[in-house]
Each structure stands twice: as structure tokens, then as C-alpha cells.
Amino acid sequence: VHLTPEEKAAVTALWGKVNVDEVGGEALGRLLVVYPWTQRFFESFGDLSSPDAVMGNPKVKAHGKKVLGAFSDGLAHLDNLKGTFAQLSELHCDKLHVDPENFRLLGNVLVCVLAHHFGKEFTPQVQAAYQKVVAGVANALAHKYH
């Protein structure tokens, strides 16, 4: 992902304020509510029968935290996202058979959650930088599919 020094600074500064536990669970939960067909990958998580059930599900929250932990690793290696996410790409492609479009959807949901949490601090410039990052991460996760 090519970011200007200003974009990189904006992404890093905001990410330092992110509560990974909270934002991860909310982002994954919103993905499952807004795009209900993604729930088929999480059938082992128990009750996903309503938006409240999804958002309150401890397994959704725990996996969201794990997902955002991996995203944090990616932020530390923006120059090598394909390498950073190679194993996760292989897992999601070969073993889990996740539609790579879901990575793009989750990235966009994450941007929405960050905007919700940070309000005016999440300026259009910050959003533009994050859109580049989530697109780069989605492409890296989809790399094994190509």
C-alpha cells in the first residue's frame, strides 16, 4: 500500500487510540448483521439469530479481537502486506473457502466503525488513508485466490 508520510502518520496516530477488543467485536458483528450471508462461516459461534444476539455474542467479540489483532500486525508492515497475510490468505482460501469479497466488506465496515467511534477526528483525509489500508489488506488476504 502506498501511503504518503502524512497518511501513514494519520493512520498510525488514530490506530494508537483504537480499543481493539471493542472495535474488533463491533466490526465483525456489524459485518454479520449487515451482510447476513457471511454468517455461514461462523455457524459454530452459536446464536446469531438477531442483531442483538450477534452483537452480544462472546465468540463474535473474541474473533473480532483476533481479526483486529491481525490488522494491527498489517499496519506495522504496510510495505509487505502480502507477506504479512500470506498464511491467513492460505487459511481462508484453502481451508475455510471464504469468498474474498468478504474481506473488502469487512474493511468497509471497519471504516464505518472507526468513523462512529472517532467522529470529527475521523476526517475525510483520515478516511481516505484508511480506505487505502483496508483495500490493501483485503487484496493481500485475497492473494492466495489468484
UniProtKB/Swiss-Prot annotation:
Red blood cells. Keywords: Acetylation, Heme, Iron, Metal-binding, Oxygen transport, Phosphoprotein, S-nitrosylation, Transport. Residues 2-146 form the Globin domain. The modification Phosphoserine is found at residue 44. The modification Phosphothreonine is found at residue 12. GO terms for cellular component: blood microparticle; haptoglobin-hemoglobin complex; hemoglobin complex. The modification N6-acetyllysine is found at residues 59, 82, 144. Heme b binds at residues 63, 92. Pfam families: Globin (PF00042). GO terms for biological process: hydrogen peroxide catabolic process. One of its GO terms (molecular function) is oxygen binding. The modification N-acetylvaline is found at residue 1. The modification S-nitrosocysteine is found at residue 93. Involved in oxygen transport from the lung to the various peripheral tissues. PANTHER family: HEMOGLOBIN FAMILY MEMBER, HEMOGLOBIN SUBUNIT BETA. Heterotetramer of two alpha chains and two beta chains. Belongs to the globin family. This is Hemoglobin subunit beta.
